[in-house]
Amino acid sequence: MTTVHTFSILLFFCSLFSASLIIAKVQHHDFVIQETPVKRLCKTRNAITVNGMFPGPTLEVNNGDTLEVKVHNRARYNITIHWHGVRQIRTGWADGPEFVTQCPIRPGKSYTYRFTIQGQEGTLWWHAHSSWLRATVYGALIIHPTPGSSFPFPKPDRQTALMLGEWWNANPVDVINQATRTGAAPNISDAYTINGQPGDLYNCSTKETVVVPINSGETSLLRVINAALNQPLFFTVANHKLTVVGADASYLKPFTTKVLMLGPGQTTDVLLTADQPPKRYYIAARAYQSAQNAPFDNTTTTAILQYKKTTTTSKPIMPVLPAFNDTNTVTSFSRKFKSLRNVVVPKTIDDNLFFTIGLGLDNCPKKFPKSRCQGLNGTRFTASMNNVSFVLPSNFSLLQAHSNGIPGVFTTDFPSKPPVKFDYTGNNISRALFQPVKGTKLYKLKYGSRVQVVLQDTNIVTSENHPIHLHGYDFYIVGEGFGNFNPKKDTSKFNLVDPPLRNTVAVPVNGWAVIRFVADNPGVWLMHCHLDVHIKWGLAMAFLVDNGVGELETLEAPPHDLPIC
C-alpha cells in the first residue's frame, strides 16, 4: 500500500514537471540595431531603431517562458538592451546596463540575452541602456499568465499597449553629448508621443495619429508604459473611467481614477469599458513637472479611442488634464496603490539604509573655458546619492570585475547614510553641500539580507519627483510622505500588510519614500533615477549581492559571447 502510494506521488510530480516543460517555451528573437529614416513634426532624420521599427517590436511571453534575443549592432554607436523590471534571477549577465552587467555591444558585433520570466505577470518593457539611445530604442514586454491560469479580474475583450515617449528633432545622442560638454542642462524634447506618434495637436502629425478601436460595451486592457526619457507624465482618456489593476507586472487591488501619473520607467495596467456614446475620444498625455523654474516640454500628445461605426471625420472629444505642477493629484493617485492580496513584507531589517537623492553643481575646473561651464552661475550640473556622484567604469563591467576578482574597478564603501545630516528639504541649504564627490562605490549585501532603503529627496539646486528604479529586484513601497523622513513619527504609518510591489518608485518632490526587499538575487544591481539626464549626471549607485549557498543561490557563469570592452 505504501509502495503504491509513494509511486502515485512520484507519478503525480513527474506529470506536473512534464506539463511545466510542455507549457514553458523558449522564444527566439533577433534585434537588428540600425539607422532608419523617421519623419516626425514635418522633418525626417535618421533614428536608431530595432528592426527598422519605432517603437521596436512588442514581445509577448507567458510567465515561465525563456527569452533568447540576439542583438546585432549595425548602428554606429555602442549599445546594450535592458529588460526593464525582469527579475533576472541568477542571470545578471542579461540585465543590460552598460559597464554595470556587461560591456556594450560594439558596432558590427552581436550578443544574445537569455533569461527566464519567473513569477511575473503584466506589463514590462525593454529599452537601450547606453547614452540616450533609448529615446527611440524601446518596446513593450507583455507577460501573460501561465497557460491554464487567468487574470485576477474578468478577461478583457481586447488588449492594447500604449507607450508614452519623447521625440527630439535633433539626434538625442548629440543633445546629451552637447550638454555633457557644456555642463548645462540638455535641450528639452520637441514632442511627446504615443506609440511613436505625436498626435494631431502637432504639425504634420494628424494622418499618423494612433487610433485605438473599440466596440460599445467592450472592456479593453490598456497597458500604459512611460518610456519618456526625462518626463513624468499624466495620462487620461476623455469621458472614461480607468480601473487600475496592475503596475510594474504586479497585480493591485482595483481602484478607479480619471488620471494616471507615470514616472519614466513605470507601467500601469488599466481596464476601460466603452460605456459612452459611440464617438471619438482623445487619449492624452502631458507633463507632470515638479522642479521649479526648470524648462520642460509643455505640449500634449494624443491618440484616439474610436468606437466602431463612428465617422472618422468627427472631431475627438478632448479631456481635461491636471495642471503641469498638480502634485496633489499625483499624491492622491499614488496612495491608492495596494497589492491585490496581503503580502509577506520583511519586518526585521538587516541593512537599514538612508539615501539622499538630488542634484548638485560642480565648480568649474580651472582648465575649463567658460563655454564648458554653462550650468548655474558658471558651474556644471551634477547629481548624486548620499553625496556620491556615480561614475561608470570603462575597461570592465562591474559584474565582470566582481566575478573575476579584478581589483581597482570599484570599491564597496558606498555610505549607508549621507555624510552630513542637514535639513534636506529646507530652503537654505549650505552651498558646501552642492558639490558631491565622484566615485564608483557599491554597497555590499549578504545573500538573504532584509533591506530597507529610505529615499529622501533634497532641495539642493531644486527638489523634484525622482523615479528611482532598482535593477534585478521588485520591492515593496511601505511608505511615502513630504518633508524630511522622521523614523520616530513616520515608521508607525508604514503599510506592512498590502503595500504595492514595484520596480520603480516615484519619490515625491520635497519628500521621501521607503522601500523594502530581500537580497535574494546575487550579482551587481544598479539603482538609479530614471530621468536619463540625472543618471548621466551621476544620480545612481549599485548593490553588490553576494552568492548564497548552492547552485540556486549563485550567479550563473558568464555567457561565451559576452562583449568585451
Swiss-Prot record:
Subcellular location: Secreted, Extracellular space, Apoplast
Residue positions binding Cu cation 1: H82, H469
Binding sites annotated in the UniProt record for Cu cation 4: H466, C529, H534
Tree of life domain: Eukaryota
Cofactors: Cu cation
Binding residue positions for Cu cation 2: H84, H127, H530
GO biological process terms, semicolon-separated: lignin catabolic process; response to iron ion starvation
Signal peptide range: 1-24
Keywords: Apoplast, Copper, Glycoprotein, Lignin degradation, Metal-binding, Oxidoreductase, Repeat, Secreted, Signal
Pfam families: Cu-oxidase (PF00394), Cu-oxidase_2 (PF07731), Cu-oxidase_3 (PF07732)
Catalysed conversion reaction: 4 hydroquinone + O2 = 4 benzosemiquinone + 2 H2O
CDD domains in alphabetical order: CuRO_1_LCC_plant (cd13849), CuRO_2_LCC_plant (cd13875), CuRO_3_LCC_plant (cd13897)
Reported function: Lignin degradation and detoxification of lignin-derived products.
GO cellular component, one term: apoplast
Classification lineage: Eukaryota, Viridiplantae, Streptophyta, Embryophyta, Tracheophyta
Tissue: Predominantly expressed in the inflorescence stem.
Similarity annotation: Belongs to the multicopper oxidase family.
Family matches, as InterPro entries: Cu-oxidase-like_N, Cu-oxidase_2nd, Cu-oxidase_C, Cu-oxidase_fam, Cu_oxidase_CS, Cu_oxidase_Cu_BS, Cupredoxin, CuRO_1_LCC
Record's protein name: Laccase-12
Residue positions the entry lists as glycosylated: N78, N187, N203, N298, N325, N377, N387, N395, N428
Residues bound to Cu cation 3: H129, H471, H528
Record domain Plastocyanin-like: where: 32-148, 158-310, 413-549
